[in-house]
Amino acid sequence: MFRIAKNLVRTFEQSVQDTLALSQDSSNLDAFFQSIPPNLLSAQLESPVDAVSEGVKHTNVNETLSGLRIVWVDEMQFQLQSFFDYIVGFNDDPVPVVSNQHGFSYPDYRRITSIFNEHCGRTLKVNIWSAKGGTFRDEYISIISKESDDLDDVSLNHDERRPSSGEAHQFQALGFKVQWTPLIASTFTYHILNVNIPDGPAQSAGLIPDEDYIIGCQDGLLATGGETLLQDIVRSRANYDLVLYVYNKVSDCVRPITVHIGPDGRLGCNVGYGFLHRIPTVKHCPQQAQQQGQDDNPVPVPVPVESETAFVPSAFTAPPVPTKKKSKNKKGTQPLAMDDYFNEGRDKSSTAAKSAESDILAPPPQKQSSSD
């Protein structure tokens, strides 16, 4: 049995190592990004990223693959999520990009603006890749045209030496802001495994094991990622407060917490980093779960009060207990009372008949008295 268990563990470790090696291979696309259709990545994969810049050869596809990351959304914009969503295409076409002399790709904002201008008064299909489990989806965004009074002013002092900033926006604000960011940046997360210091900084701040993921830090200190980066930052903030941004996979929300680091420079919890500790796919939508919970526990609709027991909850599914007792008493006592009533009637009739017979037999003594 021990040998079988040892072989199973060895096989599992080998499969994990193969998966990690495949994800770290510069020539293969990371498994986290394979949900994106290949046609949306062709513009970046075919760009001259192999160009040599200052003696460094950029050949890692996973590090250079980028998208328009959502960094801010309006409170009325429910289709997109900041930090997690990346725009990787429009109308099933890749994001227009251009390459500089060093082989790096960046968005062609002039072409992107023209795409939005062409769809004024219509909906635009936006291809979204999410860092929550590496999923892909499509969203349709309504492009509202600007009023004639709201059009952008064109500067008359045009300097030919300065490049044009692009076409004028003929559409209203979209309700979100983007930044050209590598997709791999969304994997720089630290999974809370357990709390190892009672009443330590992690426990005092409310970190939840297995559910929480540290996805950011104040001043963008975790933006570059790295297995030991969080540990180094915590040590450098000994005796100071540190603001962390934590994602909870159960509630599907991000919350900021302030952790007071002690003099020992420890956070008080074990964290996991890497391929096995990335943010998983959301199992359910919080709004749908809330609606489902409301459906499971329906609130009774108020009805006019008809009796003293009308306030009992769920009266429409099961009769109230007091009503049952009263009905039992009525069923149990009324028949007995009626039986007694009829029995009493029967007894009276029989006694009356007997008394009548006794009255008929009574005359003989009267005859004797008359003879005397």
Curated annotation (Swiss-Prot):
It comes from the Eukaryota. One of its GO terms (molecular function) is protein-containing complex binding. InterPro entries: GRASP55_65, GRASP_PDZ, PDZ_sf. Its main location: cytoplasm. PROSITE patterns: PDZ_GRASP. It is a peripheral membrane protein. Residues 312-372 are annotated as: Disordered. N-terminal acetylation; by N-terminal acetyltransferase NatC. One of its GO terms (cellular component) is COPII vesicles tethering complex. Residues 66-292 are annotated as: GRASP. GO terms for biological process: amyloid fibril formation; cellular response to starvation; endoplasmic reticulum to Golgi vesicle-mediated transport; Golgi organization; protein secretion. The modification Phosphoserine is found at S155. Residues 66-183, 188-276 form the PDZ GRASP-type domain. It is found in: Cytoplasm; Golgi apparatus, cis-Golgi network membrane. Keywords: Acetylation, Cytoplasm, ER-Golgi transport, Golgi apparatus, Membrane, Phosphoprotein, Repeat, Transport. The modification N-acetylmethionine is found at M1. Homodimer. Interacts with BUG1 (via C-terminus), probably forming a heterooligomer consisting of a GRH1 dimer and a BUG1 dimer. Interacts with COPII coat components SEC23, SEC24, SFB2 and SFB3. Involved in the spindle assembly checkpoint. Involved in ER to Golgi vesicle-mediated transport by either facilitating USO1-dependent and -independent tethering or increasing target accuracy of fusion events of COPII-coated vesicles. Present with 2730 molecules/cell in log phase SD medium. This is GRASP65 homolog protein 1. The gene is GRH1.
